[in-house]
């Protein structure tokens, strides 16, 4: 059979890439050339056509139906792909996955008649881009060291003997796919990085960072630029053209361990009883210039990543902890928002200026809380003697602002954050619910005011910008919230109408201190749309604000740095048309990149926290605790302990006779009549903890069996 006919026959059976065709019919330079000549001839004769590098027969019409997708989830016998625009996903049965891996870009054809009515199913026609870097665990299986990917722990791949990289059974590793097979299990891999034991949370966290290409070490060119600022100081020349505020008793308030200090404050009362609030933010844009290696790297990272006691900074420490950080007692360049508020806390006006400041003291939240509560000793009062007189006014202003937030219906959802306590070796030895006091709330409100002013400034000036946007919840999420509220005995209309934030706030206030408080807080958090960055102002649903942006953390967030750069140009007199030409594309790209990287950072932080919680739980296997049912599924119950650690109780361990799920809120045993409902308390025993996967299993303690 001629090469032309072979290729036509092959493509009739299955769409193929050039790589596929050369693999089947080529092998050397001569035969590869014949393959390409035959392909060119078939295209010229309009027998085959190309889509995204994949060849189809024209008669089949399949090219027009093919969809560009990304593999987002892989199971033992299935995969899910997401359309390129992120609008919907498609289920791929195992025999149609072609060995694709998460992260691969693929071409997919949907089935006309899916097995489940109303669902989207299809097959992968071709793999266009391969993601060959994977993270997982080395496991000895049937006498051979194999690789089990985190993305699909149900499968294992062959670790090539000469590419094991010193890995041992149970090690957390990163691998590269060296040879692909037709099934995922047929892929052959080699170790690219060994992190250490998968039973240590700190090793698993490092692997999570590696999987998303987040590196603690900065590229050489970035480090070279940063080194030039290693011992930098603010000179008198640097202060030219800036408002000189160094004589004012400005100070910072942060946690004791904070080294990258973005913001400082000062507050004075006016003779009329109003307030002059100054929020002074590190002028990072003065040091990170457009087009520099520092700026390119900051754009790529977009955010600092925080987990346990570690941080992977957006900027090198020479800037984040050095010349940009508003450290105590040294001159620093700042971007200041100077606000005037009336005696009731209403914002009257504001202005933005470039300034030079000297922070008087590095305030600590716990110490400020003690001063506000009147429980501080003389030594502590002495530390804050230069700024002590501001605290009563700050407390008063915060009281007014808290009242105004409540009046407009601003939501106050408890996030349920925890604090991980580590030993000197970095192992988690305790988990505690994170608490915050009055000073934390004060600083949050003052920063919110400055952020609001920045967004208002941009909208009034009609300049390109990066806004923080939070849209109202969608109908599907509201339906789930409605079901949850009904289960907790709370009547609402959310299944039909979008609630106002004020209505949601009223529900939160109504359950505060009760058994359903944490469950409903969590339910509302899950109901909310994800806040994102956009170049158009669309308001902030949760804060009930027309204008909002992120201005106050340019050391750790790129959107803040981006709008500093844009606002600086406007303050220097750049006209609107020039600003639109220069910054419109920049604002759009910064918004997109920052939104994407923020999601990745949040996922890493959440997964790392789960690993540390599991590490803590391993120390307490066999111990009993009281917990509350925080989630109900057909498979079993999620139980949250008082310290925020959550585990799973399989339905099979609840009763031997089987259970029945009622609207996602209750499991019932129809034989014995036992019920397990959201919000119920129960005694559990910790029976398993998988640090690698961040999963904890509980069993019902005998004394709590009902």
What are the roles of these predicted feature ranges?
Residues 23, 174, 179-180, 197, ...:
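Electropositive polyanion-binding surfaces
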Residues 1-278, 285-331, 369-372, 615, ...:
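Charge-lined substrate channels and their catalytic hotspots, especially those that engage the 3′ end
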